Every structure is written in structure tokens, then in C-alpha cells.
């Protein structure tokens, strides 16, 4: 472990801010003579915080900035760049103070803020002292004082990220901070409730009850890893980072020991530039690698390695634990020699399968999805594979291939809500079992009682290096922690029963399931699941002619939020879809998209046949409204990728679902880049994204999503329906929207035949493991400019296939509020049911033969005619009345209810434009 000591030299430069009277003697005493200090869990009572103290701290920060601006210092403008960090910290503190103007007492009483300000004062004073003591050595780039300055810069970086995470937009939200890993979140909730920050000793004792800590030396090493801000406290933010780095929770400390304590490739508190400098020694030994915590994307690892052609690259693994990334990289020849050593640790022992998180569905939910011709387990993006992965912390579910494709297309955040993807968990959705209770089976065990190791003497800068070395030398392989308790969660969210329309009262929506599980096999497609009688086949009219290219313009957006019911029919939640006669299909686009060349499907394309129409990014118009387009690989659009929905279907519905709004165009651009991407980058380790030479912005994992885009213009809703979420709002949904689509599409359909089916659908899909830059210009929250894409005609058979996922996306996880100002849609868009495969194929065949059924072919009876006239006199359009009657099977009372529920008479958007 000599390499560990050498590589981390000076890593403790930030220390805890004190003089460290005990030093190594104190560390050894703590390791071998654990004693009991219950009397004072807090290391020291925090000072009083007022505006005067904050301003004093600002003066110290200003002094540090002036010292660092000395030209002789010649600081590199690469993260962590202290000349950016301190001004950013100052600016965010100003924002916090402005939010608490007149309420400074409230802010001063906030425990986290007091601890933060005290630590900021200490670290700025420590930096000033470093300049005084280091003198001329500060100007030597490789000197110890200069290394300590770099360490302090990292600490300032961590502090700023933490401050932004706990005070997003300047408002305290530490008590609602969302811990990414469900098991870790449950531990924190049980141990500390809604506390934002706890003393290290309290944290250590609570953690020991779940993950036994073998010695005081191990406790000290653990503290040096988890206490990113070096203040003797552990915040919920730091805990979230640690549990993401060393996932899974069930073997947390075992993973930490294998990756941070004993692994020669681990680098504590190293920067991007320092990793490059270190690997330069092994430039002629391809496969040499080291890894560190990413300072700009806290909670993720950055792996630096030497390529076969003598380059040094740094990558960030995606959607997998570090040990899995290292194993995969070793197998593929990328990560062979940790820190240049010939012996590479075997990490396969960490790959023990975790207990599967089985999501079970109740009988009612099963029947509801059958009514829609779908199943809960079907991925609502591709409508082909079963869901097998859960995005954290938002909780949305999808299949791995869709998530991978989305990320490779440079999609930002979660495809559904744009919340930052802090982690993923494999899940399994079980088919309905009539004998099951529908509840989740959890398992767990209690750990040993907590020892009370004391570690008061941990303040000296480099003691942690000695401690890590000693711990590594004596470390034996530890068993996995018995604790694998996942939080209790209710059942997956589903829409309401249509047959309960009249008698059902509002009920709270159930939540998305959180927890860990092994990956599901995604090819079965519920062939072993008994289904009730499938829905009646509803045939779609023939597709539009394939002879004209689709034109994209910049028409004015309609004033209503469209429903995600069909690719081209997206009316408001509160209104039945109108039947426009001339509105082109691009009127829903938020901004013009450049025309793209026509291409033909490539039969060998791996995505040939994949229904990327169901990616739901671009709301299209009805086929009857669309200009026919050339038959090219089509790019679909699921509206819910752009429209955050407000169904209370997950644990964060409510106060925590105030995610920022996203422009549809950002999703469109990401999906476009998926459909027509440039040639893939040189092959790099799979599932990883790279780092550029310099990170220029600081990511801030927070309780809110990071993907903040400019909100799209909202369409006001004149209807004053209440914002009921989930069940009550969808009582007509389960069978409604396909019928609505059929009527509307037939109203103006053309009688051309066209080849249909999934075989003619293809999108370019890039290969395994591209690496993106860790340059923060490419961060999660900045959408890429649109990549020219291949747009294709959507045949009506495609639309029947696409219906599998339109609108049901938000049933798969976390909803979010899509609100701003006075133009907030009062309800989320209505979903559109999908067809089961048999129905889809039958419909496809019938379309090929040009045979369609017309549900409104017969003329209404005289009684119906009089009712229709009466409704028209009230302001309803004839098309809306006809659609409502078909949906209600000519039940005039139900049709009236539908009209009242969905149609706003006064809305100007009700008239086709």
C-alpha cells in the first residue's frame, strides 16, 4: 500500500480546520482503545450566524481570491478553480440572504447553515494561513503547500455543490432532499428523520448498527472518504454522494474497502490535471489506470487510463457501480494496471446478486392494463421490452435498451421528467399472480450494537493517509452487510377503471416502487401471463400517401396543451380533440427543425423495427392533418417526454414534484440525434462517458432536477377544472382515446394503402460504450444543439403501435408539476391506450387491405339529433359531440358528462386554426 500513501500525499490538506493536537498517537489510541464519549456528540457547538458574520466571511473570501490572483501563482483554469469557486459561493450566499430578507433569525437558526458558515470561515482562514506559511513555496507547482491549496480548492468545490444542493435557488430544502438510493434513503429517514446534517459520531454509530465498522481506524478512514467538506459533520448531501459512489447499499462498506482502502488505483482528492500528470509516468504502459471522485459530477467516478495509442483519457461510468465498470474494462483490455502495477485486484467477489426488487401488480391493476390492451411491465417507450431498470431518484421505469439509447443520443436527465439521473437500479415486474397479495416482499436483518469509537484526534492534515495505509495493510475481506432492507413502497400506479366511472370517489394514487433488484429478462413480453378477452379490434383508416416529404415550419403554437393520445392528436386535458381541417403537423413543435434528407431503412440496422415513435418527444398532428411525408425511417414522439405530468403516482408527488419545465425542443433534439447520429466515436469502455480536458462548470446534485431548460410557452386553459391527479382524472381514459383517435382520423382520412408494420421502422443506433466529455459544458442540464435527423412518415399502423405507450408514461414512475405563472395546465395530458400485439397485427393486416371499420357510419336517431342540436346551441362543436357519443356508445347522458369534462366551450383553441 505504499502507492496509496504516495498517491494521496497531501490529500488531507483541508483537514478539519484545527491544529490536530493528538496526531498519530490519537489515531492509534482510537484504533486500539475505543472509548465511550456520549457526553457531547457534536464536535463543537456552532457559532451564531447573522448578517455581520456572513459579511465578515465574504471579506475573508475576497482576501483569498486576491492571494490566488497573484500572477506568480499561475493557477490553471481547470476544476477545481478557486477563482471561480469562491465568487460562485459568494453569489449563492447573496441569493440565500435575499431569500431570507427580514427572516435572518430563521436562517441563523438553521443548523446546516450555521455549520456551513462556520466551516467556510475556517477554510478561508486556513487558506490565508497557508499562503503565510508557505511563502515562496506556494509558487512552486509541485510543492506540498501548493498541493494543500489544491485540496482546499476541492473542499471549496464540495462545499459549493452541497450549498446548492441544500439551498437550491436560495431556499432551504435540506429536509426534503431526495437521497438517490432507496435503501440509503430509508436508513437516513429511520436514523435521523428529516435532519439535514448530523455530527460524525452520531452518523458513525447509526451506520455501525447496519454496516458494522470493525475498528476505530476503519472509522477514521471512512470519515476521510465521506466527509467531503471536512467539518466533522455528515450532511444528507454527503451521505447521498457516498452511497452512490459505493453502491449497492447491501454491501456498502465491503465495496468501500475493496475500492477505496485496498485498491491501488484509488486516488483520494485528486483533480483532473493531477490524474493526467500521474498517468504520464505510465504513458508507455497502455491499460494503466487510476480512478477518483469526479469533482464536477459529485457522486460519480472518473476513471483515467492510458490508451493503446498513448493517449490519456478520463471517463465516467454510466448506470453501473464502479466495480462493474472496472471488471468490464479489464475484460475489454482498458483497465489492466492500477497505478501502473502489474497486479490488478479481482473485484468479481463484489458482483454477488442483490435480492430482486419484485414489483407486483394487483388484480384490479392487471385488469385495467388488460382493458387498455397492455401490461404494466411493458416499457412505455419502446412498447417491446419489459421494464427492467429504475431511474433514481425520480423513480421512472423503462427498459435498459431505451435508457442506453437515450443516453447515447445525448439526452439530458430522465427521458420522462428530465430530473438528473443520479443512479439506476435493476427491477423486475412480475406478471399478475392471483394467489399473491400484490405487496412487496422485503427482507433485512439487524446488525450488531454500535461501538463508540472516539476519533477526536483526526484533525491533522495527513493523518488520514497514515490511517488509510495502516487500515489497508491489515484489511481482510469483509462479508457483505446483512442489511438489505428496502423502504416500504406501495404498488405501481395505474389508471382508473372505466366501469367505475360513476361510482368511484377520488383515491390517492399509489407510488412507484423503489428498491434494488436484479436485472429482468426483457424478451418475454408477457407470453406467460393470462389475459382476459382482449379489447374489441378498432381498425384505423389507411395511412396517408407516401409521396410528399414532411415539411417543418414555425407556425404559431396552439393555445392549448395537447393530449398525448396520438402522434398527431394532442388536445387539452379538459377538451375533446378538435378536428382541424388545415393545421399542419408541425404546429405543435416549439421551434423549427431543419429539414433533413430522406433515407431508407437499413435492414441491418440494430434498431430496425424498434418503435422509436414511442419515444414521444415530438407531438405530431393527426394523420389527416399532417402533410404526407416520404416513407423514411421515422422518428416518433411521446409527448410525455416533454410534458411533466401531475399524476400522484410516486413518493415525490406533491411538494417534491416541482421540477422545472423543459422545452419540447430539447427532447426533440435529443431524439433527433438518436435517429440520425454521426459516426460513433472510437470504441471506449462500455456504458461510460468520458471527460474532456477541462471541466468548466460545477454540477450540483440536488433535491431538484438539474435539467433546467427555458420553459416552453404555455397554452392557458379556460376550463376551470380542478387539478385532480391520477385516478379521478382518468376515469374515462382507459377506453376513450383510441376511439377518439379513430373518429378524428377517419373524419379527414384518405383512402390510400400503404405498407405498414414495425419492419419498416428504423433509426440509427450507435454502438456500445461511447464516451462523452466530463466537460461541464456537456453537463446534464444543458441540451445539445439539434443533430440533423431523419424524419419519416408515420403510417397509421405505426400509430396503432405507438398507441402502446402514448400517455401512459407517467404511470411508470415519478410525476412532476409542469407549472409556471398563470399558464399552468390545470391537468396533465390524457393518456392514450395501446393495443396488445394480436390486435396490433390484425389492425396492420386490415390496413394493408384497405378494410376499415367506421364507428360513426350510421346516422344518429331523431332523438339523438335533437340532443345534438341542443348541445350545439350550447356552444359545443358537432365533431366534439360526435366523438363523445361514440365514446359513450350513444349514451347521451354520458356524452354530456364527457363534453363537460373535456370540452371548454369558450376556448378559442377549440376552433381549428
UniProtKB/Swiss-Prot annotation:
Residues 174-246 are annotated as: EF-hand-like. It comes from the Eukaryota. Residues 356-913 are annotated as: Required for ubiquitination of SPRED2. Phosphorylated on tyrosine residues by ALK, EGFR, FGR, INSR, SYK, FYN and ZAP70. Phosphorylated on several tyrosine residues by constitutively activated FGFR3. Phosphorylated on tyrosine residues by activated PDGFRA and PDGFRB. Phosphorylated on tyrosine residues in response to CSF1R, FLT1 and KIT signaling. Phosphorylated on tyrosine residues by HCK. Ubiquitinated, leading to its degradation via the proteasome. Ubiquitination is negatively regulated by IFT20. GO terms for molecular function: calcium ion binding; ephrin receptor binding; phosphatidylinositol 3-kinase regulatory subunit binding; phosphotyrosine residue binding; protein tyrosine kinase binding; SH3 domain binding; ubiquitin protein ligase activity; zinc ion binding. Residues 45-349 form the Cbl-PTB domain. Changing residue 304 to E: Abolishes interaction with ZAP70, but does not affect interaction with SLA. It is an enzyme of class 2 (transferase). Residues 771-780 have a biased composition (Acidic residues). Residues 45-173 are annotated as: 4H. Keywords: Calcium, Cell membrane, Cell projection, Cytoplasm, Golgi apparatus, Membrane, Metal-binding, Phosphoprotein, Proto-oncogene, Repeat, Transferase, Ubl conjugation, Ubl conjugation pathway, Zinc, Zinc-finger. It holds the Pfam family Cbl_N2. Residues 430-460, 476-613, 647-727, 750-787, 814-863 are annotated as: Disordered. The keyword Acetylation does not apply. The modification Phosphoserine is found at residues 437, 450, 481, 617, 640, 666-667, 692, 907. It is found in: Cytoplasm; Cell membrane; Cell projection, Cilium; Golgi apparatus. Forms homodimers; IFT20 promotes the formation of stable homodimers. Interacts (phosphorylated) with PIK3R1. Interacts with phosphorylated LAT2. Associates with NCK via its SH3 domain. The phosphorylated C-terminus interacts with CD2AP via its second SH3 domain. Binds to UBE2L3. Interacts with adapters SLA, SLA2 and with the phosphorylated C-terminus of SH2B2. Interacts with EGFR, SYK and ZAP70 via the highly conserved Cbl-N region. Interacts with FGR. Also interacts with BLK, SORBS1 and INPPL1/SHIP2. Interacts with CBLB. Interacts with TEK/TIE2 (tyrosine phosphorylated). This is E3 ubiquitin-protein ligase CBL. It comes from Mus musculus. The gene is Cbl.
